């Protein structure tokens, strides 16, 4: 039983604010230096996220999943100068964020950092269903003495990554265009690493222990994230289902099917996990789409590396996906990522087929000079702005303790930025397939705790 280890413990004098959603008390616990933070706003916004997610999985009963083990949920949040992340637990989550991620009293606008924090909250809360109760069969029970690989993380993390921002939209915390911008950012991230055409999301899932969490300097050219590409697979699958069923069904119905058949009674005795072989049948039963069509989708985009049909699927929803046109005076690029190490400009990774790769530069090289002008950690962009595409420069680097020179031909940046916007005649929406009234209830006052 993982009961004890799945409940994090924190001792100190935290700031606690509580609210009630669907009859369940939710505590937001903050530790760290917390100057002028608007805790009431954070709690109110978080309550909207929780209510929207409960409504997704239980549109009729509006029942949260925590009845199987204590009627309470806790957001343990450590606030620091510059951190970000989270880990899901059965009826809690351990979060870490920067102070600038949290709104201050009197600040009405929603900052990019606060929106990212709300996305993190949404992601970890969604895991209360999707991984903490709906589990891969190999996680039932957990093996604590060894790594347990599964090829299904594209569902458990990818689908969760898809819904984390979608829930911000459905809860009214971001606008439709803000949501489209977030989707476009994800599309840009996935499409600017060549690993997407070399590793499938199923392979990425299975190799998480050995590759995704042990990335080297060539990772961006060889692997793909089951989080980001998994979220795009979920988007495509959602649109595919909607269009095949004339918007009668969606990925929402798949999540409810998974919840009803695999998650709802997991801690009440069933201990039934999802097997890889179950996926086509689950999709078929939840949507009514033929298994042949579903298998074709899975083979191409989950187990294969075919280009996701984003443009066509979005087009059918009245959405236009475009690549932003680069201006002629766009600065050239070496197509590298660099790090500042004691003032030195060190190449962290080299994009395959980019200018640096073609010129012979390598990860680990320390950039010394470009055409005789010294490079440091802060002036690389300014030096590159002097050049045009197809021009060449002599680049000096230290490789280990050896001074080397390379002739590099610059090009326009390989990075492609995508934009997603609704067409003027758009009729379709990304609305949920079931709606109920908002039943969230804010507790009348915050509660401070010294325990």
Where would I find each of the regions flagged by the language model?
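Post-HExxH zinc-binding segment in Zn-dependent metallohydrolases
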Residues: 93-100, 133-134, 145-196
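Surface-exposed helix-capping loop/turn segments at secondary-structure junctions
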Residues: 55-69, 135-137, 170-176, 242-249, ...
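Juxtacatalytic substrate-recognition/specificity segment
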Residues: 18-153
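Solvent-exposed, acidic/flexible segments
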Residues: 35, 39-47, 110-119, 149, ...
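C-terminal recognition in membrane/secretory proteostasis and scaffolding
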Residues: 164-165, 174-451
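Intrinsically disordered, low-complexity linkers and stems that provide flexible hinges
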Residues: 1-19, 48-51
């Amino acid at each position: 039983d993982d009961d004890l280890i799945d409940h994090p413990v924190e001792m100190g004098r935290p700031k606690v604010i509580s609210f009630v959603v669907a009859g369940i008390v939710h505590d937001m616990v903050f530790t760290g230096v917390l100057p002028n933070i608007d805790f009431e706003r954070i709690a109110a916004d978080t309550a909207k996220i929780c209510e929207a997610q409960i409504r997704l999985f239980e549109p009729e009963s509006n029942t949260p999943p925590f009845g199987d083990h204590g009627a309470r949920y806790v957001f343990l949040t450590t606030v620091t100068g510059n951190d970000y992340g989270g880990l899901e637990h059965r009826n809690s989550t351990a979060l870490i964020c920067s102070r600038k991620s949290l709104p201050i009293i009197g600040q009405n606008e929603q900052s990019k950092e606060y929106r990212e924090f709300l996305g993190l909250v949404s992601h970890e809360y969604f895991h209360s269903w999707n991984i903490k109760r709906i589990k891969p069969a190999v996680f039932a029970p957990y093996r604590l003495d060894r790594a347990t690989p599964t090829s299904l993380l594209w569902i458990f993390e990818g689908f969760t990554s898809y819904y984390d921002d979608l829930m911000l939209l459905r809860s009214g915390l971001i606008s439709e265009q803000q949501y489209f911008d977030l989707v476009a950012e994800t599309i840009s991230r996935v499409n600017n690493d060549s690993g997407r055409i070399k590793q499938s999301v199923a392979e990425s899932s299975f190799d998480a222990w050995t590759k995704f969490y042990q990335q080297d300097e060539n990772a961006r050219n060889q692997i793909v994230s089951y989080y980001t590409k998994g979220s795009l697979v979920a988007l495509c699958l959602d649109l595919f289902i909607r269009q095949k069923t004339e918007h009668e069904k969606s990925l929402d119905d798949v999540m409810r099917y998974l919840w009803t058949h695999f998650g709802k009674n997991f801690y009440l005795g069933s201990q039934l996990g999802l097997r890889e072989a179950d996926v086509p049948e689950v999709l078929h039963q939840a949507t009514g789409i033929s298994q042949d069509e579903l298998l074709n989708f899975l083979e191409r985009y989950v187990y294969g590396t075919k280009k996701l049909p984003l443009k066509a699927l979005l087009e059918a929803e009245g959405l236009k996906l475009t690549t932003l046109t680069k201006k002629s005076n766009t600065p050239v690029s070496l197509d590298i990522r660099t790090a500042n190490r004691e003032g030195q400009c060190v190449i962290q990774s080299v994009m395959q087929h980019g200018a640096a790769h073609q010129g012979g530069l390598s990860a680990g090289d320390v950039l010394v000079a470009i055409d005789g002008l010294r490079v440091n950690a802060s002036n690389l962009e300014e030096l590159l702005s002097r050049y045009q595409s197809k021009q060449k420069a002599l680049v000096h680097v230290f490789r280990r303790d050896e001074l080397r020179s390379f002739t590099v031909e610059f090009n326009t940046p390989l990075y492609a930025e995508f934009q997603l916007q609704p067409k003027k005649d758009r009729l379709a929406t990304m609305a949920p397939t079931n709606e109920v009234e908002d039943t969230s209830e804010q507790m009348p006052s915050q509660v401070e705790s010294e325990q």
